Amino acid sequence: CLTEPGAGSEVGAVATKCFPTDTPGLYKIKGQKCFITSGDHDLASNIIHLVLAKTPDAKPGTAGINCLIVPKFWVNEDGSQDAWNDVTSTGIEHKMGIHGSSTLSLSFGENDNCYGWMIGDGPVEGRGKGMSQMFQMMNEERLNTGTFALGCIGSAYYAALDYTKIRKQSPKFTDPKGPSVRIIEHEDVRRMLMFQKAILEASRALLYSTYYY
């Protein structure tokens, strides 16, 4: 959870706070986040958030950011679900597309009872490691997004290819009085298929190269 009402591209402006408690590594969380992808849904019984926040003595800008694990519900040692962790959905974004994924605003600690675990050793003299930790995760997710996109492109191409082999429509351009033929035999359909395949193979090459380096 990165974006806030007052901190979008300027990540260093995050206002969400994390306050140390008597338990080492456990911090009280207070703040608002927005545009959070799959921030809340019914597909899982619990949601574990990675939250960017600053301690009261944090360095200004991105240097003072920390990354914390904040569950929607606490989990017992035996894996069973425990008490609610004061993480509240405060609004759903209405989008032009991507309706299969909920994008919403979240409030942490609205009832002053939200806690999270610091990832790593925590801040030293107000300097946190949250940005490097978050980008390590995000860089891997960017590759995963490319893999997902490649799968979608491939599925669309091969579905279209199969359809062109069974659908008959109109005679060939070179034989206007002849019988209807499979649409894969029409030059413009073949052109569109080749263009789609070129995008598919170029995307595959880009993804493989990115993974390699």
Task: Name these PLM-found stretches.
Residues C1, A15-F19, L26-K30, F35, ...:
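Structured core elements
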Residues C1, K30-I36, N46, D86-I92, ...:
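Glycine- and acidic
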Residues C1-V11, N66, E77, D86-V87, ...:
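Glycine/proline-enriched, intrinsically flexible loops and inter-domain linkers
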Residues C1-Y27, Q32-F35, H186-Y213:
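Gly/Pro-rich turn-and-neighbor structural signature
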Residues G6-S9, D40-D42, K59, K95-S102:
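Short Gly/Pro-enriched turn/cap motifs at secondary-structure boundaries
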Residues L26, K30-W84:
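A short core secondary-structure module
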Residues W74-T90, K95, S105-E141, L161-I184:
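A glycine-rich, basic-preceded beta-loop-alpha segment at the flavin cofactor/substrate interface
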Residues N139-Y213:
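Extended amphipathic alpha-helical segments enriched in small hydrophobics
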